[in-house]
Amino acid sequence: MGEVVFSTWGGKVVDHRGGPSGGGPSWAGEFGGRQLKAFIGWDGLVVTDPAVDLLAALQAYYQAVQGESCGRCVPCRVGTRVIYNVLVRIAGGEGLPSDLDLLRRVAWIVRDGSLCELGQAGAKAVLDFLDYYSEALRPFLEDSGRVAGGQRRPGPGGRVQVLASGRVLVGNDRGKGAAAASPAAGLTYKPFVTAPCLKRCPAHLDIPAYIDAIKDGRYEESLAIIRQRTALAGVLGRVCVHPCEENCRRGNVDEPLAIRGLKRFVADYEVKRGRRPVAVCGGNLFTGPWRPAGQAGGEETTAVTSGKKVAIIGAGPAGLSAAYQLAGRGYKVTIFEALPVAGGMLAVGIPSYRLPRDILAGEIEAIKALGVTINLNTRVGVDVTMDQLQRDYDAVFIATGLHASSRMGVAGEDEGYGGFIPGVKFLRDLNLDRCPSLEGKVVAVVGGGNVAMDCARSALRRGAREVHLIYRRSRAEMPAHATEVRDAEAEGVIYHFLVNPTALVAEKGNIKGMQCVRMKLGEPDDSGRRRPVPVPGTEFFLPCDIVVPAIGQAADLSFLDGRIEVGKRGTISVDPVTLATSVPGVFAGGDIVLGARTVVEAVAQGNRAAVSIDQYLRQGTTSPTVEDELDAWLEKVGVYDPEEDVGIYGGRPRQAERVAPLAERVKDFREVEGGFDFYAGRAEAERCLRCYRVGMMVLAGEGESNG
């Protein structure tokens, strides 16, 4: 890794131009095998090579910023162009002394007058350059650009270079400043665009772009942007836990944008007009937390026509996502699904009051329309073997998910009592119409995650007289999403916090209740949460007819026959970046690798697996991409500051999505949330600050420049 020569990143100046380099933030050394020489971006400048020509690099940077300007406001649209033109003039040896003051004034206007973050943050790089390099540059402008008798008198020099070391060089090619926007010999410029929300989204959807389209009423275009990276817009618009909203800079002002709700808004727009979801993947396997500047949606790729085949085990969100990307790329994809329906946990784990089955089915049909074959009721290891798949297909992706429940470890758990129904089975039977009526029953659900919430709320809808939820920690430690916790309580679920079951109690083979003990919180465990500890003498009996343990999920890996390496947690071991297993040509992703996680994380894993499978089928090997390297690097550098003072007035609260009346929604499994109406959806999109940030890497080695 190159030591820092000069940096203004994060408002902390590190200046070693006149002495040994070092200090400052940690910057990754290589991208695609090329050493990082400098970085220009939304929070300043960082240079690790004193010989980098900052003046030339700034031209390329502002060319990229100009290319990303939406054109809605004059300061950004015109101001960034003026900055670029003046930099070109100075670099070409045609600069005036007044140009430095002009640059500063225009940069201030861009920073303070732009409507979105692109311009506001984009001005910082040139302002930092002026603060620390203008005095070294000024004498050369005076020599090369005096005006006499109304005529410009060329100076003795030519093209001007401002090295990061502080030296200014003048060549003999005066007037060639425009060429300086191209990389110097031995360097490559790589501009890119990211955003706090885009970076936080596991699937790296281009959130500002699709919300921008909603602002303009371009709903079909908005949906097409989403579908570049996922076919499951309507699904994620309902069940995503929206981590992107945690990185929403609007939340620093008043409330985060309803990003998930806006995704649903455009997906519903299509459905309400009687249109079937249409896949627009197009084989674009760009999955990074950013996109190349000037290329909305990512780099285009050429479809494969080799006829190579990929087998996918499991039609859940990870398997469907991999199939979507690979089919769009031209591969022949077949999914093997043990269940009688496609969708995995989307179909048999999430109740229909959260995810209507017609929404899921429509998006699966769009994936099948790409040529994907889904073989239902086909269990690998029974109906077809792993040997057969490896023999008949060029690559295999395992995405079976976690369809077994974790054990509670209490007395009576293995006795086969009537009324003891593991949570995953409870939801599967419910969604496949195999669950008996719970009319008049008392149901006890054990657990504090989203599966436990789904079980509890579903039990109410199946007619349970009472539903108790037992959780061994406090409410604050519950892993379930806060909205689910709130809604379950509002619907009538009775919470028992700091309580743990110790034994099942049965009579004539049927559950009659549970022995429980009260808990207190001790020292933190491996999860970072305080460990629950039993309180002696607090044992009590909780009467109930049904016990539904939902404390975790487990994998069934019997079909692997021990040939693929499995980790200590009972999940498949893979390369954490490429998702390759211990067997060449076999990949795995989703919950079968991560453990019980979220739908959007499974989508991201499916997308990433498609990249590796494409690499493997083209090259015979897999390796991390530049996107992977930049993802890790941006994690360290930081794209979002939760303490940032955004500098605008608030007072535009988040729009409310429609919700079914409480008294009505527990009667059946009709969808609870109704999404935004037309006016609320547009109003919510208008709250977006469009927090795009343009960055540019200056890399060693010549190559194609995106600048």
UniProtKB/Swiss-Prot annotation:
Query: Which species is this record about?
Result: Moorella thermoacetica
Q: What does this protein do?
A: Component of a dehydrogenase that catalyzes the NADP-dependent reduction of CO(2) to formate, the first step in the synthesis of the methyl group of acetate during synthesis of acetate from CO(2). In vitro, can use methyl viologen and benzyl viologen in addition to its natural electron acceptor.
Documented EC number(s): 1.17.1.10
Q: How, per the record, is this protein's activity regulated?
A: Activity is very sensitive to oxygen. The activity in growing cells is enhanced when selenite and molybdate are added together to the growth medium. Tungstate replaces and is better than molybdate. Selenite is incorporated into the enzyme. Requires a sulfhydryl compound for activity. Inhibited by cyanide, EDTA, hypophosphite and mercaptoethanol. Sulfite inhibits the activity with NADP but not with methyl viologen as electron acceptor.
Name the predominant localization: cytoplasm
| Origin superkingdom | Bacteria
Keywords for this entry?
Cytoplasm, NADP, Oxidoreductase
| GO MF entries | 4 iron, 4 sulfur cluster binding; FMN binding; glutamate synthase (NADPH) activity; NADH dehydrogenase (ubiquinone) activity
Name of the gene encoding the protein in the UniProt record: fdhB
Q: Name one GO cellular component term.
A: cytoplasm
Asked if the Swiss-Prot or TrEMBL record annotates the protein with the keyword Oxidoreductase, the reply is yes
Output the SUPFAM superfamilies linked to this UniProt entry.
alpha-helical ferredoxin, Nqo1C-terminal domain-like, Nucleotide-binding domain
Indicate what this protein is called per its UniProt record: NADP(+)-dependent formate dehydrogenase subunit beta
Keyword NADP listed? The answer is: yes
InterPro entries per UniProt: DPD_II, FAD/NAD-bd_sf, FAD/NAD-binding_dom, Helical_ferredxn, NADH-UbQ_OxRdtase_51kDa_CS, Nuop51_4Fe4S-bd, Nuop51_4Fe4S-bd_sf
Q: How does activity depend on pH?
A: Optimum pH is 7-9.5 (with NADP as electron acceptor).
Q: Which Gene3D superfamilies match?
A: Alpha-helical ferredoxin (1.10.1060.10), FAD/NAD(P)-binding domain (3.50.50.60), NAD(P)-binding Rossmann-like Domain (3.40.50.720), NADH-ubiquinone oxidoreductase 51kDa subunit, iron-sulphur binding domain (1.20.1440.230)
What binding partners and quaternary form does the record give? Heterotetramer composed of two alpha (FdhA) and two beta (FdhB) subunits.
Activity relative to temperature: Optimum temperature is 85 degrees Celsius. In the absence of substrates, the enzyme is stable at 70 degrees Celsius but is rapidly inactivated at temperatures above 73 degrees Celsius.
Enzymatic reactions: formate + NADP(+) = CO2 + NADPH
